[in-house]
Every structure is written in C-alpha cells, then in structure tokens.
Amino acid sequence: MKTILIFLVVISLMYSGEAQEVAHTYCGRHLADTLADLCFGVEKRSGAQYAPYFWTRQYLGSRGKRSVVDECCFRPCTLDVLLSYCD
C-alpha cells in the first residue's frame, strides 16, 4: 500500500511539472492581453543599455530576427517564451 501511495505522489508531481510547460498559440487581442498581464510591473531596460544597431544585428542570431507573433501565433509557445519579450 505504501509503494502505491509513493507511486501516485511521484506521478502527480511529474504531471504537475509538465502542465506548466504546455504550449499554446496566442494571436491578436489574446496575445496583446496576455503580454500585458505577464509584463505588468516588469521593469523595462533603459535605452542606454541597448547596443548600437550595427552591433545588435551582427550578434543577435536567429532569435533576434523573430517576433512574438512568429513564435507564439504561428506556432504554440510557452509562457516562458512570452516572458522573454517583457524586457
């Protein structure tokens, strides 16, 4: 009986961890509202912290060329991806 209880606890913990990483598609107003809710209170970087345009384009890689719509509307994304657009 004790092993069954431990097994059920382990399974429930594994399931709850996976549930947090479920990807959804966010488009249009739903995308804007979700970003607003997630980013509310997140401190934005000042302009002085940004690199010059020529340096930024050179070192950004593929992530810098994608938009939030590319990543979360055209295909599913997690809340962690959306949070990366808050700063």
UniProtKB/Swiss-Prot annotation:
Family: Belongs to the insulin family.
Signal sequence region: 1-19
GO cellular component: extracellular space
Predominant localisation class: secreted
Disulfide bonds: C27-C73, C39-C86, C72-C77
Extra information: Silk worm has two kinds of PTTH: 4K-PTTH and 22K-PTTH; there are many forms of 4K-PTTH.
Keyword terms: Cleavage on pair of basic residues, Disulfide bond, Hormone, Secreted, Signal
Role according to the record: Brain peptide responsible for activation of prothoracic glands to produce ecdysone in insects.
Name of the gene: BBXB10
Taxonomic lineage from the root: Eukaryota, Metazoa, Ecdysozoa, Arthropoda, Hexapoda
Quaternary context: Heterodimer of a B chain and an A chain linked by two disulfide bonds.
Highest taxon, organism lineage: Eukaryota
Cell compartment(s), UniProt: Secreted
Protein's recorded name: Bombyxin B-10
Propiece residues: 46-64
Pfam family membership, one: Insulin
Any one Gene Ontology molecular-function term assigned to this protein's record: growth factor activity
InterPro entries referenced in this protein's UniProt entry, alphabetically: Bombyxin (IPR017097), Bombyxin_B (IPR027285), Insulin-like (IPR016179), Insulin-like_sf (IPR036438), Insulin_CS (IPR022353), Insulin_family (IPR022352)
Organism: Bombyx mori
